[in-house]
Design a protein with these regions (language model features):
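Hydrophobic multi-pass inner-membrane translocation pores used for secretion
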Residues: 333-336, 461
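Extracytoplasmic/secreted cell-surface and envelope-processing proteins
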Residues: 87-89, 317-318, 345-347, 375-380
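Short beta-alpha connecting loops at secondary-structure transitions
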Residues: 122-124, 345, 363-367
Length: 593
């Protein structure tokens, strides 16, 4: 295939993947936009940073972009805010831009306010999937909130909780009616609600439970009763979970692309920390069940994405969801998980290590703002800079001077010499000679006949002077040493130092500055998040916007009406005139505009 045709096909295929593109910020070294494509978002995003570093404002920027793109993509989102500031900022922004967002299906859930209630019956009848799966996920979510690693350590709670939920589901009731099923003294209502169950295990269990003495029943159910208390005691949660009419349906929310903004802050004292955590955990567990009921498409682009933003996620994400992050993309759930530092995950109960490992491995894109502590910085340095740190990087080189080679050359030698000498000699002498002469005959000396005497005197002087001069020239071979520098030793930069430098880069960052490495990137980049403008929205404008939004939702009702419906239903149960078996969800009267 021609390469141009191939890449043209690839570009066309990339455009067909549904979802929203996000602009994370500006790459500060180049000034270019750092973007996440819909395909990149499917592998999830992890954001962490200390308080005041820009993490929350970045999340707000991303949520705004998703809402602005709703008219084009129709992709929904769930935003869970444990502090309330993100919720307030988004409501103010949407109220200010109300005209352009009036067709976006906004679902605000605020645990701080008591005027309106979002009906959320977790025991609602499900059109798809096996209710046993939803019930089991509900049980696991409750166990997680109470710091239990699944239900293998609490088999009694698991069994009793399932028996309670099966009875409520088959009788088309709500979680509030669990208080009648756990009544230790009056078992009349309990017996009525547990008669004729089609689920064999639940029917068998209640047949045994209903013949227990009050003392034995209390011994069986006391622990389970304690775990249901947040649903039964906290008024805000009672009103939400106690509606058996039209309910928030996360399966429909995914299909319709609803934007659910949940403020689970404990500010105002309307809900406890335990209750807020339970609500958020149940919401996420229900979302996971709904996504699995929708199923996967045959191709990656067949499933419309649903975006999930969770700040301080370690308090709400169950191990079941965490360990299945790699599967979540197939079901269309694309998560953005945020917290202050990684070690928070490890400290989140018995399941912390499991959630930590799953998030670090499966959230393939990461943005890290300034944070502290070696125990937090080190794993992120490894994750962000892996493949960039060079173990062959030279830190120090030592050189020594050595004879590199010997060169043979010729050298001309010239010499000059001069010499001189002088000498002087004086001599004198005297010589006297005497002699006799005779004959020798027959061997005998005869008398001398001759005598001779002579003498001589002599003297003299001699002088000598010698001078000489000479020169010579000759060529002789010589050997010359060529000196040079030779590397004698090399010290490579140790991995510990490379990690330390990476940790320093993460630590030493200004506000709104972060280090990002998205899935598919070969190296991390320094980025600056965009400035998120604060809207000049007044409280009156925000309240008016919320009222219009609530009035359009068929499952939103005034809290007074919600309380009245619960009282009427419970009076019927107590009086014995319950029509629970024949109950069908009835939409509350709602102004639709």
């Amino acid at each position: 295939m021609d390469s141009r045709i191939f890449f043209k096909y690839i570009r066309r295929a990339m455009r067909l993947i549904p979802g929203n593109k996000l602009e994370l910020g500006i790459v500060d070294s180049k000034g270019a936009l750092l973007e996440m494509t819909p395909q990149m978002r499917s592998t999830h995003l992890y954001i962490c940073g200390s308080t005041g570093t820009g993490k929350s404002k970045m999340i707000e920027s991303l949520v705004r972009q998703d809402i602005q793109q709703w008219h084009k993509s129709k992709c929904g989102a769930l935003i869970i805010d444990p502090h309330g500031s993100l919720y307030d900022s988004l409501i103010n922004w949407m109220a200010w831009n109300g005209d352009s967002l009036k067709h976006v299906p906004i679902v605000p859930i605020d645990l701080r306010q008591n005027d309106w209630t979002i009906a959320y019956n977790v025991m609602r009848q499900r059109l798809a999937g096996d209710p046993a799966v939803a019930i089991n996920n509900f049980v696991l979510a409750m166990a997680y909130v109470f710091n239990t690693d699944g239900t293998h350590e609490t088999p009694l709670f698991a069994r009793l909780c399932k028996e309670i939920l099966w009875a409520l589901y088959e009788k088309k009731l709500t979680i509030l009616e669990a208080e009648y099923l756990m009544d230790r003294v009056d078992k009349r209502v309990r017996s009525e609600l547990t008669q004729g169950l089609s689920k064999h295990s639940a029917a068998k269990g209640w047949a045994f439970n209903n013949v227990l003495s009050p003392r034995d029943f209390n011994a069986q159910f006391s622990s389970t009763d304690n775990r249901f208390n947040p649903f039964l005691d906290i008024e805000k949660l009672r009103l939400m979970f106690g509606q058996n009419g039209t309910s928030l349906d996360l399966g429909k929310a995914i299909e319709d692309g609803q934007i659910i903004i949940a403020n689970v802050s404990t500010q105002g004292g309307c809900v406890s920390e335990e209750g807020a955590a339970l609500f958020a955990t149940i919401l996420l567990s229900d979302l996971w069940t709904a996504a699995k009921e929708r199923g996967k498409g045959t191709e990656e682009g067949d499933v419309k994405p649903f975006y999930v933003y969770i700040d301080e996620f370690q308090n709400f994400v169950t191990p079941t969801i965490a360990k299945n992050l790699d599967q979540a993309r197939g079901f269309g759930l694309h998560l953005t998980l945020a917290n202050q530092f990684p070690r928070q995950i490890l400290h989140a109960g018995a399941n912390g290590a499991q959630v930590y490992d799953s998030v670090m491995a499966n959230a393939r894109s990461k943005v890290v703002f300034s944070l502290e502590g070696k125990e937090n910085l080190e794993p992120l340095a490894y994750s962000l800079f892996m493949g960039v740190m060079n173990p062959d990087e030279i830190k120090l080189e030592l050189y020594s001077t050595k004879v590199m080679e010997i060169v043979e050359e010729t050298r001309t030698i010239r010499s000059t010499s001069e010499s001189s000498s002088e000498g002087e000699g004086i001599f004198a002498g005297q010589t006297i000679t005497e002699s006799e002469g005779g004959a020798i005959y027959g061997g005998d000396q005869q008398d001398a006949r001759l005598w001779n005497k002579s003498g001589a005197i002599s003297d003299g002087t001699s002088r000598m002077s010698i001078r000489g001069r000479g020169s010579s020239e000759s060529e002789v071979p010589v050997f010359r040493n060529i000196l040079g520098k030779e590397k004698s030793s090399v010290q490579f930069r140790p991995l510990t130092e490379l990690i330390h430098r990476a940790m320093a880069a993460l630590f030493d960052q200004d506000q709104r500055h972060g280090v990002a490495r998205l899935v598919g990137m070969r190296a991390p980049v320094n980025m600056v998040t965009p400035t998120v403008a604060k809207m000049p929205t007044t409280k009156k404008m925000a309240d008016s916007f919320l009222t219009r939004v609530y009035e359009k939702l068929p499952f939103a009702l005034k809290s007074a009406d919600a309380h009245k419906q619960i009282e009427e239903r419970q009076q019927k149960l107590v009086s014995g005139n319950s029509d629970a078996d024949d109950a069908e969800p009835v939409p509350a009267k709602r102004k639709i505009s």
